[in-house]
Amino acid sequence: MKKNMSFKIIATVGLWAAIGLTACKAPQLSPDGERAVLPEGDGHTYDTAFVKPLEWNVFFQDSILQGYVEVALQNNYSFKQSMERVTMSRANLQRAKGLLLPEVGLGIGTSVNRFGEYTMDGVGNSETNVPSLAKDKHIPDPYRDFGLFLNFQWEADIWGKLTRKKQAAVARWMASVEATRFAQSVLISELAVHYYELIGLDKRRDVLEEAHISSKRSYELTRQLKKEGAETQLAVDQFHARMLLIESKLLENDQLIGEKERAIACLLGVFPFEIRRMSFEELRQIPFPLSDGVPANMLTLRPDVRAAEMELLASKADVMAAKAAFYPSLVLGAGGGFNSFDLGKWFTAPASQRIALSQYHETALKAYTEVLDLYCAGLNQVERVRLKEVETVAHQRSVTNANELFKLNYVGFLEVLSANERYLDSELERIDIITDLCRKKILLYRALGGGC
């Protein structure tokens, strides 16, 4: 009777405690998780028909580069690591889904006890095993105990806490997927930039070799004219110095070519090898099928913006789960009752949400600025290419005229040197501008989602 009274008192106190906790009200959190508001326009006219990102194998129409991209997606170590992070997030998602399901446990146990002869249990057992007691009721010595246990437990999601945890896990898994897509976009664009810069270096080498042949021819001509008394040693030395300068630039260019080839091999996850590539003239003919869209609308395609948005959704779900954790949990099992509430992330979740919101707005702002900068730079670069090509043609014509006039002794060697230097500088700059234009198109493609 005493035991029953004690149980009733404990149960009554526990019930009133549960009722009291149920009457508590969790503090309200301000729903400040709006999406970032971006400008409607920037003064330019865009083609708003482009609403989906191009796949990488459509944007990059060079079959050689496409083959390298496929190898990189299979072998690149950094990309493999990002894929493993997705696997980890998927495992956490499965765990969060399991929280909504009942837990069933099965246990098997066995033990052997031998009681000492002069202990309380040993003496008690010897007195219990009297001859008048049936044999099957005797306590064996040693005493063997076998057990089979089955238990059941299920936490009812009455406040939505477990559902919110599942939503947070789903959002974080989606964020990890977006992070992997971003890693793929970065990998492909970085590989393409190195590839096109390598093609530009090939063209620079061709131009430098042509300039070296021309400077050597001029050097030999001035030496011959000096022997005839028509030129001075100063002219010979100037042309000789120019020839040596171009040889030095050729060595530097070859070094850069080797570095680019090794960088590409590293992105492919293989040891260095000779990289096959198209010619510079073929590169000029390949289109980059990227329509121009409103940056504010296109930002939704960026994996980093989508990942930040998923993190924001996850943090909001964490806040709701923390609010639900403020209330007691109802756990159904072998017996019914209320567990004490778990404060858990109650104090940290709101701050985490504000951090995620701030990071989301920061990511969106940086993304918008990056897209606009690249778009404007691309427009300017196209005009620079046009002007530089006209300038290069004019310098090339000047070189031809200067050489002819020098042979006729109408101009001195300084005019010839000056014309050749201006043409070489203009041609090298033209190659750099075209290569940089390709790089900006690739970066703009990545900034608008990168085909993910």
For the regions a protein language model found, what residue spans apply to each?
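Transmembrane beta-barrel architecture of outer-membrane proteins
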Residues: 65-67, 88, 145-147, 193, ...
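Small/polar (Gly/Ser/Thr/Ala-rich) solvent-exposed segments
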Residues: 80, 103-123, 133-142, 147, ...
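Membrane-embedded segments
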Residues: 84, 88-91
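Short segments within alpha-helical structural elements
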Residues: 216-220, 245-273, 322, 390-448
